[in-house]
A protein has these predicted regions:
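Glycine-/small-residue-rich active-site loops that bind phosphorylated ligands and cofactors
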Residues: 37, 84-85, 119-120, 239
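Structural recognition of the conserved hydrophobic beta-strand(s) that form the central parallel beta-sheet
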Residues: 112-115, 128, 139-145
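Localized chelating/binding microdomains
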Residues: 78-84, 101, 110, 163-164, ...
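Conserved alpha-helical scaffold flanking the Walker A/P-loop in AAA+ ATPase domains
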Residues: 13-18, 87-111, 119, 123, ...
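AAA+/P-loop NTPase substrate/partner-engagement loops
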Residues: 56-88, 149
Length: 320
């Protein structure tokens, strides 16, 4: 049920209006940050759309609902990268386009879920565009993305756009309390992009403790021109999926602290840098953005070595 993730309700309420009036566009673009449980919304929507008895909810017992529950519905198609981290190819989209020209096997809607839509390469995007321009009757494309800027503008313009907004801090904290997490620092949400689901996972798997260890090590490494940075570089390599984001959040909060800004989600180490050195913090953050772009473009690079170079540069500007 969507009650599990109440922040999904506003988008569902709008989708439900379209289902009840049978005014569903040929293409929907569903956007959210990662970790907001959007897969639950997709499941809920697909079951309601394909149900043979009710217009805006799944009855749970018709033939279509039973097929959906067993993941064998012939009119529900998922288009995903064949391997994690790879692109959705033009051949996959062409196969999807051919299916879109066929009739529904259960005389209802046909639903094509493309996830993540931003992983389509250029050829795949262009192939899909032709189908979106002339969608078949009772044929719906649901494009799911965490980064809509990577989609072709022409594709975005042909979709009805819905955004799942992260819950407010108050709503997220309340949800985590309901899950049994009573003592959650507000800054944990920031480290997890506002996602209470990811924050809860971070608390349970030790990621929050790992961040605090990184924060202490980084601040110590930036405390004097002669400080050792090797431990911090090793930690960054060990937590390669998170450390660059951790450093970014810490530096941006530290810049705010230089101007006396205080926020509920501010990281505890933000006030521990050398005072009156906004320019140094800005320079370090700018170099970090360049490093992040480099690592994203070339995933095979040695992060520990690159982190070492960045830490040396940061130490110079933060200790000056």
């Amino acid at each position: 049920m969507l009650n599990d993730y109440p922040w999904l309700q506003p988008v569902w309420d709008n989708l439900k209006v379209g289902l009840e009036s049978d005014r569903i566009p040929g293409a929907l673009l569903l956007q959210s940050e990662q970790g907001l449980g959007i897969e639950k919304l997709i499941e809920f929507f697909s079951q309601a759309l394909l149900c043979q008895n009710y217009a805006s909810e799944a009855c749970g017992f018709c033939h279509s609902c039973q097929l959906n529950q067993s993941h064998n519905h012939p009119d529900l198609h998922w288009i995903k990268p064949e391997k994690e981290g790879k692109a959705i190819t033009v051949d996959q989209v062409r196969a999807c386009n051919r299916l879109a020209q066929e009739s529904s096997q259960l005389n209802g809607y046909r639903l094509f879920v493309i996830e993540p839509a931003d992983s389509m390469n250029e050829s795949a995007s262009n192939a899909l565009l032709k189908t979106l321009e002339e969608p078949g009757a009772k044929c719906l494309f649901l494009l799911v993305t965490h980064n809509q800027e990577r989609l072709l503008p022409t594709i975005r313009s042909r979709c009805q756009h819905w955004v799942v907004a992260p819950p407010s801090t108050e709503q997220a904290m309340q949800w985590m309390r309901e899950q049994g997490a009573q003592q959650v620092p507000a800054y944990a949400l920031k480290l997890n992009m506002g996602s209470p689901i990811k924050t809860l996972d971070a608390l349970n798997n030790g990621d929050l403790d790992a961040y605090l260890a990184f924060e202490r090590t980084f601040i110590k490494a930036m405390s004097s021109p002669a400080s050792d940075i090797s431990e911090c570089a090793s930690l960054m390599a060990k937590h390669s999926d998170q450390s660059l984001d951790w450093a970014w959040y810490l530096l941006t909060d530290a810049q705010k602290a230089q101007f006396g800004v205080s926020e509920a989600q501010m990281l505890p180490g933000a006030i521990k840098f050398q005072p009156n050195n906004y320019n140094g913090l800005y320079s370090s953050a700018k170099a970090l953005m360049d490093l992040k772009a480099q690592v994203q473009a070339f995933p095979g690079l040695n992060l520990e070595l690159l982190s070492m170079y960045w830490l040396i540069e940061s130490r110079e500007v933060l200790c000056s």
